[in-house]
Amino acid sequence: MPDNTPPVSQQGLPLGMAFRWVLAITLLLGSVLSAIIPPGKSPDEADHMVRAYLLSQGHVFLKTERCQGENALCHNGSTMSGGPVDQGLLEYFRLHDPYRRHKESMLDLQAGRVIPWRGQEVFFHAPGTGYYFPLVYLPQATALALGKTLGLTVENSYYLARAFAMTSGVLVLTLAFYIFWPQPAVLALLLVPMSLFQTASASIDFLCNALAILVIACFLRVATLRKEAPNSLFWMMALAVFLLGTARAHLASMVLLMAAAAWPTRRIQPWAAAATATVAILAWMALAIPATIDFRIPREMGTGQVVAYYLGAPLQLVRVLAHTVTDGNMLNSYVASFLGVFFDQPLTHRTYAWLAGLVALVILPCLASPRRLLQAALARSALVLTGVAGTLLAFLAMLFTWTPHPATLVQGVQGRYLLVPAMLLLLAVCSWEPAVHPWRQRLRWALLYVLGGVSMVVSVHRLLYAYYVQPAVALPSAVQAEPGALEPSPPLGPGSTIMLQLPPATSEPTAPATYGIGFLVGTYGQTLQGTAQLTLTDRAGQHHGVEVSLDDVTDNTYVFAKVPPGHYSQVELRIIQGQAAFSVWTFRPAAGNAARPTEAPVPMACTMTIREDRSMQLMPGCPGPK
């Protein structure tokens, strides 16, 4: 039977083709999800953005501050590790705190999009990122620095960071697929909902996954070329392995691939590259681990003491690991967070079953024959060893640094940590060459398209349902048509003020607090640009000021503003700046109306309040929002 293995010069995609395919697919999938996924929903995304901001300001290491007392943020006179962060960035992520579990609303969108860089910094704790070599945050740091320099809002800077993070991953994947052709097993794991979700976030996951695939591509290329492999491949591997090992500690095991790749060459430089990566990773850990102060998980023993304990009690270590990997609830959580959990929003059990089945269908046609397995026994053994070591390190890292001691189960391991080890183990049993028969090649790609399509559909459906579909809200019976007429207020421009009356139900003594206010505007067919100020007076007579963006407001729509929760008796609207005059719609009841028997009814501004119980109140006689 003829050997259909491509010559070594053709074992990667042409550079232009690789870039076009990776860019098109990533932009199509990632950009759609990026437009849907609310800010801050990726695990620890706020901390990652804080670390990126610190890098943009020249802070390589995290710092601590002196403090007094003993509490969650102060221990032995020191805070947890962190650094000085712009108040605007912190304000933005407080607004989008994922633990609020609120649906996204127009109030959140309008409040978030106007937050500027404040220019004032306060100390913020982000100890979970202190172990990572900061170079991996360079794309996000560049975006934040650029956004701040250009005067963009925090939100625009944040989405620029998402775009830069996605672009950096695209470039690394392009290089990987140029070095060695895309492996269907690897692509399948990149297309599960969890991977797509992280691709669209501003975290470091997509770049780390791309770097891991680059290391794998270099390894497979070297395994094919053997002694003819150029030294540049090994130094490229060394850089990627260093970035991986210092950003994802369990992936430091990929130095084993470098050693296995260097063995057949019988040259000094490949071994020098492997040694350099190993020493650099250990050196960074020796610097970062002692310098990072993290007491989020209260423990009486430090990381070093926990390591020493298990070194002296290896049987206890085996028992903890065995108990963890045989616990049914833990296994279910690993599968769910491997295939797809959007922060705290899992998919259905049926969806997980379908996704697992599709991944298996993609992999089955790629399995290598026994002859192929034996032809590259050393390389395949290295893949197995590295995958197993990476999995073990993921559990050990969380046991030593995160799990309360003494432990019965390892806590903190997420299924997405095992993505790269799974790739390595699958590649150990899959064929690395293109399919011999064209129909099999077409079958592989067809299955990948189906998997990608299904992943996108279930991801979009779950994201919309979890974060946007509101529960049914019934308007009060007072919102009914009544005799009268809508009238525009006098045109308002910069410096103009108008008093806004609130719906009568807002003033009820037992009414829930108001946290959102809207007012209906008429723009005379124009699209507004500008800023307004709401001054709210509560029942105690205290005043609260809220800035409102008028940008992109169109004719006959409500402008919403998020306000501090409270009970308000008076609201004044003042126009600060703007390019076009507009009016606030008012409702004047008909004279002689039984509800308002006065001869000259006073027009009431068309306002709307949103209360903390998520109910809405509308000024009687006014139209509701579109």
Stretches found by the model and what they are:
Residues 159-182:
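Transmembrane-helix motifs of polytopic, lipid-linked glycan transferases
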Residues 5, 218-228, 252-281:
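Perimembrane helix-loop-helix junctions
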Residues 59-160:
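Interfacial juxtamembrane loops and adjacent helix segments
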Residues 288-371:
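Membrane-lumen/periplasm interface segments of multi-pass, membrane-embedded glycan/lipid transferases
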Residues 182, 227-230, 266-272, 364-389:
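Membrane-interface helix-loop-helix junctions at transmembrane boundaries of multi-pass membrane enzymes
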Residues 471-626:
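C-terminal luminal/periplasmic domains and tails of membrane-associated envelope-modifying transferases
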Residues 26, 183-200, 206-223, 233-244, ...:
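Membrane-embedded helix bundles of polyisoprenyl
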Residues 1-31, 74, 272-277, 375, ...:
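Start-transfer (signal-anchor) and selected internal transmembrane alpha helices
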